[in-house]
Every structure is written in C-alpha cells, then in structure tokens.
A protein has these predicted regions:
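Signal-transmission/dimerization alpha-helices at domain junctions
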Residues: 69, 114-115
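All-alpha helical catalytic cores of prenyl diphosphate-utilizing isoprenoid enzymes
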Residues: 14-18, 33-37, 103, 117-167
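Multi-pass membrane catalytic core of lipid/isoprenoid biosynthesis enzymes
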Residues: 94-114
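Conserved N-terminal diphosphate/IPP-binding helix and adjacent helical/loop segment
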Residues: 3-69, 75, 79-94, 130, ...
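Hydrophobic alpha-helical core bundles mediating ligand binding, dimerization, or RNAP-core interactions
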Residues: 28, 108-109, 160
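Residue-level signal for inorganic ion chemistry
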Residues: 43, 112, 138
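Conserved small/polar residues in nucleotide/adenosyl-binding loops
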Residues: 1-5, 163-170
Length: 173
C-alpha cells in the first residue's frame, strides 16, 4: 500500500467515525492513535486491484471496512482477555471500562456496515456480515475451551478457522 493509499484509508476511517457522542469520539481517536500496520487494508487494496474493484474509492471504502472490523474485534478481545496493554498503550477497557469498549466496538462494526450498504454490493456486504458472525462464533468457541488443557485438535482448528481464516478468506473474494 503506497503512502497515498494509506492516507486515503486513514481519512476514510476518521471521517466515518465522527460522532456527536463525546466519549465515542474520544475512544475511537485514542484507538486509532495506537497505530497498527494496516496489513488488512494493504491486502484488501491489492485484492481489489486484482479484481478490478477500484471504481471511485470502492477499494478504499472496503479497506477501511476491513480495518474497522479488525479494530472492533481487538476492542472486544481486550475486554474478553482483560488486557491492559495493546501496542504499548493502555487498552480502551482499562481507561473507559468494559461496557464502553464493547459498545464502541459495536459502533465500529455498524459504521463498517453503513459503508458497505452505501456501496451497494450486496454480495460483499453478505460476505463481511458472514465473516463478522463467524469471527464472533470462533471467539465463543475459544472462550468455551480456554481452560481445557487437553483441547482437541479439531476444536482448536475450528476456533482458528472461525477467528482467523474466515477473515483472510474474505480478503480473497
């Protein structure tokens, strides 16, 4: 992803996260400042280029959506894992609490789906919705089996499949 593309993705994310609710605004800005490599955006932009999905800023919108889904899952994971630090900074749940963190993660997901509805590609919207659903199911599987030392290989592979592979599969569509 060239610098121009990264800037476009960042601008799209920032513009879509504007909120009249001050706490939502603070939390999303804080989370975005923690950085990240934007690898998912890079992969999305490359796949969009290969699939010729670049009319207007459709590729940038899709890359922003993928990043928003990722950010939301990180917020939810930090609550589930009681994480205090992510990327060298305090997590949202450490600063603002679990309830706010979950709700802001949900806010990011809703913003992603708003963008995809505006795009009008129902097939892609369905794919992102299915991916989000399967990520959530994978997290529940992980939570359900996290205390089991003798976790079955099949259960572990199902969990990984839901939480990671489905997200990567989305990028290749």
């Amino acid at each position: 992803m060239c610098i121009r593309d990264r800037i476009l993705v960042e601008e799209k994310i920032n513009s879509r996260l504007a909120s009249k609710v001050e706490l939502v605004q603070k939390m999303t800005k804080y989370h975005l400042k923690t950085g990240g490599k934007r690898l998912r955006a890079l992969l999305t932009l490359q796949c969009a280029k290969i699939c010729e999905y670049q009319k207007g800023l459709r590729d940038v919108n899709l890359a922003a959506c993928v990043e928003l889904i990722h950010a939301a899952t990180l917020m939810h994971d930090d609550v589930i894992d009681s994480a205090d630090i992510r990327r060298g900074k305090k997590t949202l749940n450490t600063i603002w609490g679990n309830h706010s963190s979950i709700l802001v993660g949900d806010y990011l997901l809703s913003k992603c789906f708003e963008m995809m509805v505006e795009d009008g590609n129902l097939e892609l919207l369905k794919l992102l919705a299915t991916t989000s659903s399967e990520i959530a199911q994978g997290e529940v599987l992980q939570l359900q089996h996290n205390k089991e030392i003798d976790i079955l290989e099949e259960t572990y592979l199902n969990t990984v499949s839901y939480t990671h592979l489905r997200a990567h599969e989305t990028l290749s569509h």
